[in-house]
Amino acid sequence: MSLNAVNHRRVLHRMPELDDELPDTTAYVRKVLEPLGAEVFSPIKGGVCAYFDAGAEETVALRADMDALPVTECTGLFFASERPGRMHACGHDGHTAIELGLAEETARMIRAGEKLPRNVLFVFQPAEETTGGAGRICETGVFEKYRVTRIFGLHLWPNLPEGSVWSRPGPMMARSNEVTLKVTGRSVHVSRAAEGLDALRAGVDWMNAAYAWTEALPPDVLRTLQFGRMTAGTVRNAVAGSAEIQGTLRTYDEDAAEMIRSHLRTLAAETAERTGCGLEVSFRTGYPAVWN
């Protein structure tokens, strides 16, 4: 199984696709699954499922994500991405390859007459990095139809020793909130800076205040707030008339997330009053935290 999984991963790594636009990826997944004797179907755009009926009352589901990231690969690997601006940089090619190998092994066991304690539903999910393909699959009722009582997923983690698996009860992975601050000021030439409203400086002030406040929270409020992108202004010798800061907030529970979101809004209002700029902070909530 391991050799097949390695081969699957290298094929998939060469042809990364984004979001739920996965025609080549799903074609390859179906090509592997369809000869195995499973019921293969597409629950949503860009998704594939394979159901192995072992004659059991209950079904266990195994899930893998398939989409890549808008990143240019520079690894020099012989199986590197052949698509500029797209790369399997988060390991979803590995997740899909592992699940394909497990599907092949499940088919072998059934053909050999081995008794499985449960039926098996393999779920290949699109849009994990973007719009939430998992939720759309859940909404189709597929898990109720096939009597799924438990579902397992995994994520490759290079920091772990090779050959090891890590899990624990309780929180495993934090929930994500995308944070965006938009600042509106007034652009003037730097020789008349006093007549302008500096959107860049207002954005930086807000960001520094946000960092200072979250870093001072008690250690039992598990959180990460990090800003990774900032754009502002048009030229070096003019006060920036607009600015935008983008970041990520991660927490394990919704109460902590809402407390931090509320304070970031308060900081935006205070910064607007102090600077005269308009500040609008918005959030896009991602997946909930993983709890076992």
Task: List PLM regions with ranges.
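Acidic/His- and Gly-rich active-site-bordering loop/insert found
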Residues: 1-88, 93, 97, 104-118
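Conserved short loop/turn motifs at secondary-structure junctions
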Residues: 18, 124-127, 285-289
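General structural feature for long, well-ordered alpha-helical segments within catalytic domains
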Residues: 4-8, 21-32, 58, 86, ...
